[in-house]
A protein has these predicted regions:
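Active-site-surrounding "flap" and adjacent substrate/cofactor-binding loops of secreted or lumenal enzymes
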Residues: 18, 66-80, 106-131
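Structural helix-adjacent loops and short alpha-helical linkers that scaffold large soluble proteins
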Residues: 39-44, 61-67, 103-113, 153-166
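Alpha-helical support elements that line or immediately flank enzyme active sites
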Residues: 48-63, 86-109, 149-154
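Conserved oxyanion/phosphate-binding beta-strand-loop segments in alpha/beta enzyme cores
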Residues: 38-84
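Second-shell loop/turn segments in exported
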Residues: 12-13, 35-40, 84-86, 97-102, ...
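Secondary-structure capping and boundary motifs in well-ordered enzyme cores
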Residues: 43-44, 83-92, 137-144
Length: 181
C-alpha cells in the first residue's frame, strides 16, 4: 500500500481534475504529433492516428515511481534510471510496433530492452508474453530477440550488448519440454 500511496502522491499530487485532463490531452497531442500525415482525406488521418494511439497502449509501465517492481521470481526489484515495462505481446508486436518505437520513442525502446534483460536475469530466459511480472507462455518463439537486435543495430540505448547476446543464446537453448503451457 505504501508504494501505491507514493505513486499517487507523485503522479497526482493535486486534487484538480481539469489540470490532469489538460495535461493528459497535451501529452497525447505531443505523442500523436510525432508523425505527421499529409492527406486531404480526413478519414485516412482519423484511421492513422487511431492506429497510432492504439500502438501506444501497450507495453505498460510496470515499475513504481521509485523504480520498484515485482519480478518473475516473485521478488521486489529496483530499476536504476530506467522504467520497467510489462504487457509484452511480442508475438503480435515484434514486427511493427517495436520497430515503430525505435523511431518514435527510442528512450522507451531502450527501457523495454532493459526490461527484457531484467526478466532474463530474474527468470533465466527472455519474455515470450510477459504480463505484469509473470510469463504467460501464451505464444511460441523468441520474439524478444529481434526487438533487441533491432534496437542494437539502430544504436538505441545503453543496455549491455554482451548481456543481451547471452540472454538471446540462453533463451534459444532452453529445453521447451520443461515449459508447461
Amino acid at each position: 500500500m505504501q508504494g501505491a500511496e507514493r505513486n499517487l502522491s507523485a503522479e497526482v499530487p493535486d486534487n484538480d481534475f481539469d489540470k490532469y485532463r489538460n495535461a493528459i490531452r497535451d501529452n497525447w497531442n505531443r505523442q500523436l504529433s510525432k508523425i505527421k500525415v499529409e492527406s486531404s482525406n480526413n478519414d485516412d488521418k482519423v484511421n492513422f492516428y487511431t492506429a497510432l494511439y492504439h500502438s501506444m497502449i501497450a507495453p505498460t509501465i510496470y515499475s513504481d515511481v521509485d523504480g520498484a517492481y515485482y519480478g518473475p521470481d516473485k521478488q521486489i526489484h529496483q530499476t536504476n534510471g530506467w522504467v520497467n515495462y510489462s504487457t509484452f505481446s511480442l508475438w503480435d508486436t515484434f514486427r511493427a510496433a517495436h520497430p515503430l518505437f525505435t523511431y518514435t520513442e527510442p528512450e522507451r525502446a531502450n527501457d523495454m530492452v532493459k526490461s527484457f534483460l531484467a526478466f532474463y536475469e530474474q527468470n533465466g530466459r527472455l519474455p515470450v508474453w510477459n504480463f505484469y511480472g509473470s510469463e504467460t507462455d501464451m505464444m511460441i518463439g523468441y520474439h524478444a530477440v529481434p526487438v533487441i537486435v533491432d534496437a542494437y543495430l539502430k544504436g538505441i540505448g545503453n543496455f549491455d550488448p554482451e548481456k543481451a547476446l547471452e540472454a538471446c543464446v540462453a533463451t534459444a537453448n532452453i529445453d521447451l519440454s520443461l515449459i508447461h503451457i
